[in-house]
Amino acid sequence: MQNTDTTKYIIHSKINADGVIERPDIVGAIFGQTEGLLGADLDLRDLQKTGRIGRIEVMVTAKGGKTKGNIFVPSSLDKVETSILAASLETIDRVGPCSAKIEVFQVEDVRAVKRKKIIERAKLIFTKMFDETVPESQELADEVRQSVRVDELTYYGKSRIPCGPNVLNSDAIIILEGRADILNLLRYGIKNTICVGGTNIPPEVAELTKKKTVTAFTDGDRGGELIIRELLQVADIDYVARAPDGKCVEDLVQKEIIRALRRKVPVEQIIEKYGIQERENEDSACRLERVSKRKIRAPEIVPRIAEKKLHKRVKVHRVSPKADIHEEEFPEEMEETGPERAPEKIFEKVTERIPERPAEKTSAAAERVEARTSVAKPAVMARAVPATRVTRGKAAAEKGPAVKVPGGEAVRVSPAPARQAPAPVSPEAIRFRPHVDALKGTLTARILDSDDKVIEEIAVRDLASRLKNYRDNVKSVVFDGVITQRLVDIASSNEIKNLIGVKIGNIAKVPADMEVLTSSML
């Protein structure tokens, strides 16, 4: 084949002849029968002289008085001219004395084959030659960074425990599992670290935790959990941070390390989770002292606000020195103190005696004072006992005579109750308490209709998937589990009005037409 360097296409054709013919007969027939057929520009002899087509290859075999074979015509013409040339071969109908038929079945693109070879060779060159001879810039940076980290790594105590250079000078330290974890944090500039080398906590580390604010940062696997359990028993730690599930601290990148340390939780929150009791020795006393500083004394805020508001109350005088009266103006903040504290705040000592007056002479001002009377509202969804109310009209007149305060307004008085009335049973408790008691500790759920009749009783683990496919008259769900935002959303989509569980989880929003209750509220 000639001019293989310039060949673009190869025309593949097959020939069938009724007789015995040889290669020279076929080549002569091709040149002879196509001469002048396509014009001077596409004459095969001229194209072969100029190198536009290559050497015509013929491979034939004769058997049983017939000849079969293949013809290959290389071409450096473009696609259009090559197609015309291939079609002209099919016009040959005789080779020598025999009738013959030529059929083109493929036009091979030689450049595509070359491209495949180039790709395969490039893969081989890339994998075999570059890995060992040309280091990447990242490898150079890692090598320099590794040398710096090794120089910064120091040791603590007689046991030469690996640690960062700032462990002794820093007020807060991070306890890690091993030396590789320290090197990884040094890579990102965190130098106040020390390792414990497994679940056997060194005494030097346990002693160091008494003097500093300590964060335990462990792997997100079973081993990390065991180290935390050991630290809770022998050391004095303040916070706990965990790597993502299934990951090690030594494999974390900078973003994951910062995110995990920001999500650290106080040790008090995980003591109950791991079932560890605090030690009753001096170490525990130190921890409890620090804990008390971190606790937010939210319960102290509400009484302080209520005390300030009590100075603004209206002073009401009583008829006799032994009778107390209901206060006629309540601060709004009394809602937060709870209904059981409200009766203590709504009575005032009498400072002077006022003679009795008939109830018939009650002025219009007294009626206005009664109209403005407010009552303490319960803090949790109207489930608690309501505070004592000051009634209007005739009922108020029956309780006691009207008296006049120094400001000139008349109010009605009544003796203080000897003790608080018993708490009434809420309708929800009557409806759902039997179901709650029956399901306690069973990890099952009951789906109720509008008449509070049980439609179906299933396991809690199947409740979410079952509610998604439920289309019956479901109005309430009572189950022995935690109420989550996912369950609230599913119940809202099915127009369920009541959702009762053991306790409420992290819920961001609850529909206005849905009651979310716990067994303690009932």
Swiss-Prot record:
Its cofactor is Mg(2+). Its EC number is 2.7.7.101. GO terms for cellular component: cytoplasm; DNA-directed RNA polymerase complex; exosome (RNase complex); primosome complex. Mg(2+) 1 binds at E177, D219. GO terms for molecular function: DNA-directed RNA polymerase activity; metal ion binding; poly(A) binding. Mg(2+) 2 binds at D219, D221. Residues 171-257 form the Toprim domain. Binds two Mg(2+) per subunit. It comes from the Archaea. Keywords: DNA replication, DNA-directed RNA polymerase, Exosome, Magnesium, Metal-binding, Nucleotidyltransferase, Primosome, Transcription, Transferase. PROSITE patterns: TOPRIM (PS50880). It is an enzyme of class 2 (transferase). InterPro entries: DnaG_primase (IPR050219), Primase_DnaG_arc (IPR020607), TOPRIM_DnaG/twinkle (IPR034154), TOPRIM_dom (IPR006171). Transmembrane segments: none annotated. Signal peptide: none annotated. GO terms for biological process: DNA replication, synthesis of primer. Disulfide bonds: none annotated. It catalyses: ssDNA + n NTP = ssDNA/pppN(pN)n-1 hybrid + (n-1) diphosphate. Forms a ternary complex with MCM helicase and DNA. Component of the archaeal exosome complex. Belongs to the archaeal DnaG primase family. RNA polymerase that catalyzes the synthesis of short RNA molecules used as primers for DNA polymerase during DNA replication. Also part of the exosome, which is a complex involved in RNA degradation. Acts as a poly(A)-binding protein that enhances the interaction between heteromeric, adenine-rich transcripts and the exosome. HAMAP family: DNA_primase_DnaG_arc (MF_00007). This is DNA primase DnaG.
